[in-house]
């Protein structure tokens, strides 16, 4: 029977301040440079993990994510930081775990419905439910007063 291995998780941020201190928590670290980006690979509590900075903007995030998938065998992704905005009622320091991600900054009308991603037939894309659950549990365990945001459009 083949040995199962943990999926590699990447934690990405646009800015170094949004990842402050994470690299120091990793064990067995290795710095990897690919496609003009610097990644730190290691383990956190036994979980294979890659840390990376994308720079600002969704194109920078998309190209960094592509590099992670193609060259570093990443199967799961968590983005930390503001990620483009703060929803109503959310304060700096709050933990928000998204259930979906959205196309929000390109209006393709009249060719397609508003916000729809051409070729995909959708404006919202569901996150991995198992990863969402793990992140919610971790947030609740690590924060004194964790608020749970259920608004799928945050």
Model-derived regions, located:
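Short, conserved "active-site rim" segments that organize catalytic pockets and cofactor/ligand binding
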Residues: 7-26, 30, 48
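Glycine-rich phosphate- or other oxyanion-binding loops that anchor nucleotides, phosphorylated ligands
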Residues: 8-9, 33-154
